[in-house]
């Protein structure tokens, strides 16, 4: 699916971070709901670790009594459902791609290529946007240069340059595609308390440490479950009470609230009206320190 012009006019939120961000989920102190994790299906964990650890610079950690391997990046964890071949990549789903910001985009793009991964910037931006050596320059004055990489098993990753950023990499955004993108933005604002933002190339909503971007899609999109990015995750304070509120608002829990002693956290799942599978957690900010 070729993205619309709204995607490629990336006047994206430049997330403010500090040098303490390496402690993971530091944004959790800034609000009752923050972004928590990406959860990938994979049949090739080594390849995923080569991309997210060796290339992007994440830290491989083990959590819980089962020593679950997780990649830690500033303000996001990446979990893996291993030995689970995805049914497709992220493109074509409600979550088209995930984004990270870096202070030196040229350096990161060169590293992605040197490690054997494909850059797909040319096919992911508008035909009239100049791409030089796999980097698309700012779409407008004051905008950011961007690039797109294809991680293993079809996970599309956007890299956004933020030259003022003090750390090597941090989570930047989750980018949703939907023919009803404005309605989708409103749902995330209402459900998770994200702060609505308009006036850019596409509707957006902000939570501490991350932007949720919503581009229109000319083509139908499918649910995330089973695809390379199986679900997204939000870290929620007082999760049990939050789940009761969701149910009172008519949102059905796909997986009811429960505690996971092996990880020292609590979880619940919902699905948004367009098929995005969403895990809600409480405690990831502690177990990942």
In which residue ranges do the predicted regions lie?
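Short, surface-exposed ligand-recognition loops at beta-strand->loop->(often short) alpha-helix junctions
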Residues: 39-44, 100-102, 176-182, 235-237
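Bacterial N-terminal signal peptides
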Residues: 6-20
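Amphipathic alpha-helical segments
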Residues: 43-60, 108-115, 180-196, 248-249
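Mid-chain, structured segments of secreted extracytoplasmic proteins
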Residues: 65-117
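Mature N-terminal segment immediately following signal peptide/propeptide cleavage
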Residues: 29-65, 69-70
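Eukaryotic phosphotyrosine signaling hubs
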Residues: 35, 94-97, 228-231
């Amino acid at each position: 699916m070729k993205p619309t012009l709204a995607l490629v006019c990336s006047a994206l939120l430049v997330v403010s971070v500090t040098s303490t961000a390496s402690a993971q989920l530091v944004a959790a102190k800034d609000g009752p709901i923050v972004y928590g994790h990406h959860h990938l299906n994979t049949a090739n964990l080594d390849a995923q670790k080569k991309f997210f650890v060796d290339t992007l610079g994440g830290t491989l950690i083990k959590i819980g009594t089962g020593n679950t391997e997780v990649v830690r990046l500033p303000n996001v964890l990446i979990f893996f459902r291993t030995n689970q071949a995805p049914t497709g990549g992220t493109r074509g789903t409600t979550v088209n791609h995930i984004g990270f910001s870096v202070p030196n985009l040229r350096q990161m793009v060169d590293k992605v290529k040197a490690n054997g991964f494909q850059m797909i910037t040319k096919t992911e931006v508008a035909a009239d946007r100049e791409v030089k050596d796999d980097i698309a320059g700012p779409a407008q004055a004051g905008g950011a240069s961007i690039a797109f990489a294809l991680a293993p098993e079809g996970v599309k990753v956007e890299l956004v340059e933020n030259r003022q950023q003090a750390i090597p990499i941090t989570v930047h955004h989750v980018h949703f595609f939907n023919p009803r993108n404005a309605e989708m933005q409103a749902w995330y604002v209402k459900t998770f308390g994200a702060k609505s933002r308009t006036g850019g190339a596409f509707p957006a909503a902000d939570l501490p440490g991350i932007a949720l971007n919503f581009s229109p899609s000319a083509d139908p999109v499918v649910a995330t479950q089973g695809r390379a990015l199986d679900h997204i995750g939000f870290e929620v304070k007082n999760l049990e009470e939050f789940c009761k509120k969701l149910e009172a608002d008519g949102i059905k829990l796909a997986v009811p609230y429960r505690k996971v002693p092996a990880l020292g956290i609590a979880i619940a799942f919902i699905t948004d009206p367009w098929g995005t599978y969403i895990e809600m957690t409480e405690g990831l900010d502690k177990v990942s320190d």
